[in-house]
Amino acid sequence: MTIRAVVRGVGHYLPDRVVPNSELEAIVETTDEWIRTRSGIERRHFAAEGQTTSDLAARAARAALDDAGLQPDDIDTLIVATSTADLTFPSAATMVQAALGMTRGFAFDVQAVCAGFVYALANADALIRSGQAQRVLVIGAETFSRLMDWNDRATCVLFGDGAGAVVLEGTESAGTSADRGILATDLHSDGRFKDLLYVDGGSSTGTTGHLRMQGREVFRHAVEKLAETAHTALEKAGLGAGDVDWIVPHQANLRIISATAQRMQVPMDRVILTVQDHGNTSAASIPLALSVGKARGQIKEGDLLVTEAIGGGLAWGSVVLRW
């Protein structure tokens, strides 16, 4: 028998404030048509004054726990994927642990920017397979609205805030590709491309900084690397693109999503899309899409999913899982 990390519950949280493209027209030189044409984004959510990343994460975590029928102390490990933690330290994960009232287990953050949730899933899978954890709560949460340069129309219109979470549980199975759970993971990074996507602040500058991006170069790397890592993960699982029920991509930009799907030879009607409603929520985008996809009735038990993401670093990767 094989131990698999199986999704037992999923949930998400979006801040109340919805910001349509029309609202951004009054802030920066842009138009609704310009934003839609270049990104597919129609609206996004922004966190309220005083609402932190850990607040969003805790709300998503509670939703996932409710979906799983579990209590906080049923969880062994809590992982938060984020680039916008409330403080330099302690971790957002320990803050969420406290907010949930968890009194056991351990918690830590994963920082791989937009690829963070994929990295966090891979870490959770390894912990479960090795026997170090039985149930892992994996959260992606971001407040990227606070990193925007509102004079840079190429980037400030793209991002939003939100959080999503999944509960993974170790379950015995025969270990075939037909069994539920995470089947394969594939992770990569290449620090030579740091200047393509970064925030120009931190401890070395004493500032929070703003997001900087070379959009055309990021697009080129994204399409190539995302399709490649997805195919590699599928090969590790002994599967191919024709076996995929749903691609659940990082919701960065509709152009990247559609170009990657085309490169993988997967039709767009088998791609979960939320970018139009959420914008780019970085590490939160995949768990948000998983939760929304399930709520819509698209993702069903037994479906084969491929999640893929790329972010600053550059860091990228994919996970193949049977829902």
UniProtKB/Swiss-Prot annotation:
Protein name: Beta-ketoacyl-[acyl-carrier-protein] synthase III
Pathway(s): Lipid metabolism; fatty acid biosynthesis
Keyword Acyltransferase found: yes
Assembly mode: Homodimer.
EC nos: 2.3.1.180
Region (ACP-binding), start-end ranges: 251-255
Family: Belongs to the thiolase-like superfamily. FabH family.
Summary of the function given for this chain in its UniProt record: Catalyzes the condensation reaction of fatty acid synthesis by the addition to an acyl acceptor of two carbons from malonyl-ACP. Catalyzes the first condensation reaction which initiates fatty acid synthesis and may therefore play a role in governing the total rate of fatty acid production. Possesses both acetoacetyl-ACP synthase and acetyl transacylase activities. Its substrate specificity determines the biosynthesis of branched-chain and/or straight-chain of fatty acids.
InterPro entries: ACP_syn_III_C (IPR013747), ACP_syn_III_N (IPR013751), FabH (IPR004655), Thiolase-like (IPR016039)
UniProt subcellular location: Cytoplasm
Reactions that this protein is recorded to catalyse: malonyl-[ACP] + acetyl-CoA + H(+) = 3-oxobutanoyl-[ACP] + CO2 + CoA
Pfam families: ACP_syn_III, ACP_syn_III_C
GO biological process, one term: secondary metabolite biosynthetic process
Catalytic residues, chain numbering: C114, H250, N280
UniProt entry tagged with the keyword Lipid biosynthesis: yes
Domain notes: The last Arg residue of the ACP-binding site is essential for the weak association between ACP/AcpP and FabH.
Species: Cereibacter sphaeroides (strain ATCC 17029 / ATH 2.4.9)
Gene Ontology terms, MF aspect: 3-oxoacyl-[acyl-carrier-protein] synthase activity; beta-ketoacyl-acyl-carrier-protein synthase III activity
Top EC class of this enzyme: transferase
CDD domains: KAS_III
One GO CC term on file: cytoplasm
Keywords: Acyltransferase, Cytoplasm, Fatty acid biosynthesis, Fatty acid metabolism, Lipid biosynthesis, Lipid metabolism, Multifunctional enzyme, Transferase
Principal cellular location given in the protein's record: cytoplasm
